[in-house]
């Protein structure tokens, strides 16, 4: 597994790749995270919105019970509403930027993850280094595909986030987050891995 640090995507010899594909390698699929899916499941926009909603409901309940004076509860609510709007907007913007700068590439030999807003990075993961792939589907039609790497291969959770499987800190797993048509991508991955060396596990 190799890592290549890039300064600009405009310099890519082939979109999403640090170098042109060898003649014997075939491009199977390219895609990016869905911004809404990434915002909800990686950046926690929904959880933050629910938190502020409950906080506002509590403030309104206190106002209705007379614990806050009428001229005081508005002063309590307005900053909370503004903070809620700023927090969700900021997280949504970060998710959108991350999705825009991310490109996942699958060939018949490897996976290539290009990601990073401030510091773009490209990572090549040969299919022969993948022990298993796990597919998770969501009701909005998007999904995640996480990869368990063979030892001693490791990735940094901090460097790869949010392109890692959630809650896997001790042995982080690279993950295609919030991709559209994930079942089809998983099938392409299964076929490519089977043709290359075989990949046990689910996808």
Predicted segments with their positions:
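Conserved beta-hairpin
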Residues: 87-132
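Short, charged cytosolic
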Residues: 2-31
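A membrane-cytosol interface segment of integral membrane proteins
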Residues: 2-4, 139-203
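Residue-level signature of catalytic and energy-coupling elements of molecular machines
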Residues: 29, 111, 185
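Long, distal/terminal scaffolding or interaction modules
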Residues: 23, 53-54, 124
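Flexible glycine-/small-residue-rich
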Residues: 31, 108, 149-151
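Alpha-helical transmembrane spans
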Residues: 36-101
């Amino acid at each position: 597994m190799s890592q290549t640090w890039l300064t600009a995507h405009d310099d890519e010899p082939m979109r999403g790749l640090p170098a042109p594909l060898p003649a014997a390698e075939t491009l199977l699929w390219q895609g990016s995270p869905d911004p809404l899916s990434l915002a909800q499941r990686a950046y926690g926009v929904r959880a933050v919105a629910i938190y502020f909603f409950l906080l506002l409901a509590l403030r309104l309940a206190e106002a209705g019970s007379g614990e806050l004076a009428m001229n005081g509860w508005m002063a309590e609510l307005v900053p909370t509403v503004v903070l809620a709007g700023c927090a969700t907007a900021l997280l949504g913007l970060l998710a959108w930027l991350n999705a825009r700068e991310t490109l996942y590439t699958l060939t018949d030999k490897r996976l290539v993850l290009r990601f990073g807003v401030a510091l773009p990075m490209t990572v090549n993961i040969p299919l022969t280094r993948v022990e298993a792939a796990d597919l998770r589907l969501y009701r909005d039609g998007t999904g995640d595909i996480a990869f368990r790497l063979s030892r001693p291969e490791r990735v940094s959770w901090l460097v790869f986030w949010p392109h890692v499987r959630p809650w896997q800190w001790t042995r982080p797993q690279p993950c295609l987050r919030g991709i559209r048509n994930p079942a089809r991508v998983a099938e392409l991955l299964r076929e490519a891995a089977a043709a290359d060396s075989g990949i046990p596990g689910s996808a």
